């Protein structure tokens, strides 16, 4: 029997050009039904599911014809018939034949699926553990509540510490359950065992106060609380019906624990602030150690290093080495992974290996023509190379696919400032703040700088107060210092000079040129400019377009 199931996902649709392929076996073109036989339909679905990747002839034969005795001629006739159904011509090739390899669908495809049903929410109360040390009990209680709160997207709602922290007696427990009616609660006590501890845990369903599970967990001395939290999470998965962590990413990342670390790391990476990138670096490094054979953490970690270098919070040369190591590791695990190839394309162009970088980007785009990641990396590459119009177009394509991508929005803001001027940049900055980047400190620092350049000092000072002091580092500090110069002129120079003296590797950071120009004068800035130019420094190619450096051009 064939392995192919014609209805793998209810209501799923593939959209390409003016065609819509439904999972009920129907094909529409301009809202008119097109007849497509079962075999041709099955082949088309497999090619579309492959998302631009090559599908071998053997795979198609196995999945569509199964155990039936057929040869390649049957597949060839099927492909021919499918091309006629799609009205292929020389200008509109849908199916590409790769001789000796198989077939590939080579047109942009959008997959439309109905929203996944939201998981049923299960409310959980975590009671303070009984321990000899009250302070340690409170600390552990806080850590477990904070850790398990990360599982909210998967249907677990944890009551906050402020509600449960004083719930220690039977009377307190019964009152809490009666007032808030959580679905489940966890209680526990810690018993010393030499240098280690035994944690005895009970999971109780509140309705009927039914004991679901008891377990003793040994905690070795100095073991982090996160390990206990992960073990509790696994127990909850077994005990509470309907709780389901992200099984797709679990299969890719080996375990629930590594999946949750990865998701937290990706979240921090996407926040795109100095503090969040530092947190992402820690989490993604931890994830790589937990799942050394998974591709996604290596790609995310490579992007994290590049972002930190761009933001001026990590040595650029060292960041490039680290990013390349992780991108190469990802390609070793899957040499056709488009995200890894796109990252290597960006890294090679930063190293002035333009031909290699271009080929890698081309390959990545062929494998994944509608990837927000690839669009962002390529737009970033074009921006750094000084191709502003092309960069803006590509970044806009990225934002259409992923409107919430903070890094792409901020890149677009820089391009707009360089390409069409400060007024357009201020308008775009206000637009981004009203959408997805309300509190992003990089965006705020850029707006402060733009407003200061326009002489709107009071508004700039007001906006500066919205930036957290823990985020004022790297490029954010540079932007705010330049704004201070615009506002206070000569009075700001001592602070700027002090900042420049404290910066390491100033000779490898073209992003400091605007401050060098105002603090040390045109002669010293021009000397740095020529040095970067002679070195063919691509970070310099990004900064030499800055309107503030027009004197040095």
Curated annotation (Swiss-Prot):
Q: What GO terms in the biological process aspect are recorded for it? A: phosphorelay signal transduction system; regulation of DNA-templated transcription
Q: Mind listing the UniProt keywords for this protein, alphabetically?
A: Activator, DNA-binding, Phosphoprotein, TPR repeat, Transcription, Transcription regulation, Two-component regulatory system, Virulence
- The reply on keyword Acyltransferase is no
InterPro entries to which the protein is assigned, alphabetical = OmpR/PhoB-type_DNA-bd, Sig_transdc_resp-reg_C-effctor, TPR-like_helical_dom_sf, TPR_rpt, WH-like_DNA-bd_sf
* UniProt induction comment: Expressed in response to both environmental conditions and genetic regulatory factors. Transcription is subject to complex control and is stimulated by the SPI1-encoded HilC and HilD.
GO MF annotation terms: DNA binding
Q: Which domain of life is it from?
A: Bacteria
The yes or no answer to whether the keyword Cytoplasm is present is no
PROSITE patterns the UniProt entry points to: OMPR_PHOB, TPR, TPR_REGION
At which residues is the DNA-binding region annotated? 11-107
Start-end of the TPR repeats?
Answer: 372-405
Q: Point out residues bearing the modification 4-aspartylphosphate.
A: 62
Annotated Pfam families: Trans_reg_C (PF00486)
Give coiled-coil spans as residue ranges: none
Task: Give a short account of what the protein does.
Answer: The main transcriptional regulator of the Salmonella pathogenicity island 1 (SPI1) gene expression. Activates the expression of invasion genes by a direct action at their promoters and also indirectly by increasing the level of invF. Also binds upstream of prgH and directly activates the expression of prgHIJK operon.
Give the protein name, as stated in the record: Transcriptional regulator HilA
Organism equals: Salmonella typhi
| Source lineage | Bacteria, Pseudomonadati, Pseudomonadota, Gammaproteobacteria, Enterobacterales
**Gene behind this chain?**
hilA
